[in-house]
């Protein structure tokens, strides 16, 4: 009997259906000499700090850095049932071999190995490595199972990544939280990513627009423009000199140009396009793509390659044809297929580019959720683009002279639309299609060198230099992908912040931690840093916010994966960095109150006349010698199922009383309205009720 372990139940069911394990059991499927079970995400993970020593339950500066000598792996608290099933299956006497069928990548490898090792399994291990959930791909994968030891490097890299995140997250978060008296979540990749955004906002805030002026001359059949000028008076003077004058055509240059189709999608490029064109977050796109993968409609999502392998060349025309037939908006557009434009074995590592599968032919696409359908459409369209003919056009550049200055005009004539015919058809069907740039394909009249033309009109156009744009998920993903790239070896496999598989999760963590805010602006959603984000980057040392260092770590993880670097060497480097950080970092003078939000004054203190401000747990006099306070969890208010709000406290402080509705009566169980009066005895803030006598004080 052979045991197959998938990453989730839906994948296990697909695998079981192909290999004939159709009998349902408790937590697994069985049949045809196979048992197929599943994890539920990460069943096991690295233990928390207090598992190594109970004293670590409390965050103390003196305990840092926390550097485990012997790492502990523990089972997830809510995952015991499925873990016990897997442990029993792995160690069953009749099981002779265990097949790792978790996702073919770092995380999938770690999910399986953690369970395998925690269960104490010693059975021979094989690896199912597939890039598609199509039945044919599954059958081929099981026919070519690989030895599990071939992926020890992948396991080592995944475990080192997890340990590095643990070390930096635990130690840096505790260090800065203790020093600045506020929980500050710091991550190996999160913090440099946040630094990119904060730096961009600083550039925007300090940007000063510079005006410029351009003189444009309207000629018969075309308009020519001069270079930008910073002196308005000089621009006006040039305009006057050109008004009514003759223009001499100095040069007419016509070139035929070709624009190659874009490469196929890797995950990051798809996430960027889905954000720009559809407004999806990176995480939404990944979720939709994962679902499509499990429905056998597209290939493995978490890839960093944009090419296919040579063994796919022969079958590609058939796939392209059926994909084209599934895209209704491409009717009337000739479809071509040049496989060589997308084949490059050297640029495919673990998985090839994301493409649709042949199951698209028989799928009911109208039954798909809207988000999945839109993402699948992008993936299908990109395949058609990538194998299509180049976009060929003729570009004409005219240089004219007037009043001793040169003016230029450009024109474009499409010779063969190529892949852009598909792009135009797709954009035409979109509700919020991006408008084409004015004059982008405007042809120029026939002109000859030496020809003279009269100036019909001369105008001065005024403009201003533009500030950098706020990050969107599209542009931030691009910045993360290229961070530190210029300083990395040319052949480096892993560059930038994070990996295609982790970037979406990093952005979501920054949002949930309150460091990033998504703000709608016209057709885009901007990513803006919070007050705490700016404060955090202000106090973080360079090594924790440097994209270069984190990009170098990603490169080192790639070396571990290839067996070129010992895991201990990588982790020792991080431990040394953390020791230096804890030993040398001091609170930056003047930043002690950076993480304290501005306090809003709600009224005057009835005892000392000082200012009363709202804090997290109540309203307090800001005079250090005065102890006046109205707590938000005050028992008198809690008994009436109310909490003193800012408006209520403000009225009590200013008028001594406030009308409150919906007070709860413990005696009757009903609610009533009354006036609450503040009575301060110098030690405690007390409250009493007054009722409108004309209504009989009815409760």
Question: Residue spans of the language-model regions?
Answer:
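C-terminal or mid-to-C-terminal helical accessory/interaction module adjacent to the motor/catalytic core
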Residues: 93, 135-219, 254-258
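Intrinsically disordered, low-complexity regulatory segments
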Residues: 1-162, 166, 467
């Amino acid at each position: 009997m052979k045991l197959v372990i998938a990453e989730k139940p839906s994948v296990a069911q697909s695998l079981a259906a192909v290999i004939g394990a159709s009998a349902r059991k408790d937590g697994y499927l069985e049949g045809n000499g196979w048992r197929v079970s599943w994890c539920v995400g990460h069943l096991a993970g690295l233990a928390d700090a207090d598992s190594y020593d109970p004293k670590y339950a409390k965050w103390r500066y003196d305990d840092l850095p926390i550097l485990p000598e012997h790492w502990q792996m523990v089972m997830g608290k809510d995952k015991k049932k499925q873990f016990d099933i897997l442990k029993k299956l792995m160690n069953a006497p009749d099981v002779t071999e265990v097949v790792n069928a978790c996702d073919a990548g770092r995380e999938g490898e770690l999910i399986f190995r953690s369970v395998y090792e925690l269960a104490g399994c010693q059975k021979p291990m094989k690896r199912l490595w597939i890039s598609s959930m199509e039945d044919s791909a599954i059958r081929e994968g099981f026919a070519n199972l690989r030895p599990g030891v071939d992926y020890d490097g992948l396991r080592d890299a995944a475990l080192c990544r997890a340990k590095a995140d643990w070390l930096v997250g635990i130690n840096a978060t505790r260090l800065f939280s203790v020093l600045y008296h506020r929980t500050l979540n710091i991550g190996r990749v999160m913090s440099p990513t946040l630094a990119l955004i904060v730096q961009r906002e600083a550039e925007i805030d300090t940007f000063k627009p510079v005006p410029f002026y351009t003189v444009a001359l309207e000629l018969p059949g075309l308009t020519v423009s001069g270079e930008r000028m910073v002196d308005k008076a000089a621009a006006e003077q040039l305009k006057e000199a050109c008004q009514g004058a003759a223009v001499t055509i100095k040069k007419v240059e016509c070139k035929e140009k070709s624009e190659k189709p874009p490469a196929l999608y890797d995950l990051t490029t798809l996430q960027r396009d889905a954000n720009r064109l559809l407004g999806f977050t990176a995480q939404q796109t990944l979720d939709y793509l994962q679902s499509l993968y499990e429905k056998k409609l597209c290939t493995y999502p978490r890839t960093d390659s944009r090419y296919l392998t040579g063994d796919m060349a022969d079958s590609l025309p058939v796939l392209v044809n059926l994909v084209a037939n599934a895209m209704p908006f491409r009717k009337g557009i000739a479809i071509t297929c040049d496989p060589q434009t997308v084949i490059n074995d050297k640029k495919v590592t673990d998985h090839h580019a994301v493409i649709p599968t042949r199951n698209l032919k028989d799928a009911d696409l109208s039954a798909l959720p809207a988000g999945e359908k839109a993402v699948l459409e992008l993936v299908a369209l990109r395949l058609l683009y990538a194998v299509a003919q180049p976009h060929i056009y003729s570009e004409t550049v005219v240089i004219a002279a007037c009043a001793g200055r040169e003016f230029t005009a450009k024109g474009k004539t499409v010779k063969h639309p190529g892949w852009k015919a598909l792009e135009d058809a797709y954009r035409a069907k979109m509700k919020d299609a991006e408008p084409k740039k004015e004059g982008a394909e405007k042809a120029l009249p026939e002109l000859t060198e030496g020809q003279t033309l009269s100036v019909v009109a001369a105008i001065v156009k005024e403009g201003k230099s533009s500030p950098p744009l706020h990050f969107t998920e599209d542009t931030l993903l691009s910045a993360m992908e290229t961070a530190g790239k210029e300083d990395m070896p040319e052949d480096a496999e892993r560059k930038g912040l994070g990996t295609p598989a982790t970037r979406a999760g990093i952005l979501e963590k920054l949002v949930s931690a309150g460091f990033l805010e998504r703000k709608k602006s016209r057709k885009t959603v901007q990513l803006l840093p919070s007050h705490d984000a700016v404060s955090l980057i202000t106090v973080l040392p360079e090594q924790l916010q440097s994209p270069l260092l984190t990009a170098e770590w990603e490169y080192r993880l790639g070396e571990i994966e290839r067996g070129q670097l010992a895991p201990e060497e990588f982790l020792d480097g991080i431990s040394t960095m953390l020791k230096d950080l804890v030993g040398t970092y001091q609170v930056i003078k003047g930043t002690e109150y950076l993480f304290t939000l501005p306090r809003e004054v709600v009224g005057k203190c009835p005892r000392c006349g000082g200012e009363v401000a709202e804090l997290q747990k109540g309203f307090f006099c800001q005079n250090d010698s005065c102890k006046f306070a109205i707590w938000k969890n005050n028992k008198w208010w809690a008994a009436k199922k109310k909490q003193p709000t800012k408006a209520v406290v403000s009225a009590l402080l200013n008028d001594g009383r406030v009308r409150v509705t919906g007070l709860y009566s413990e005696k009757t169980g009903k609610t009533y309205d009354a006036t609450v009066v503040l009575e301060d005895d110098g030690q405690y803030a007390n409250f009493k009720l007054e009722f409108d006598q004309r209504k009989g004080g009815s409760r």
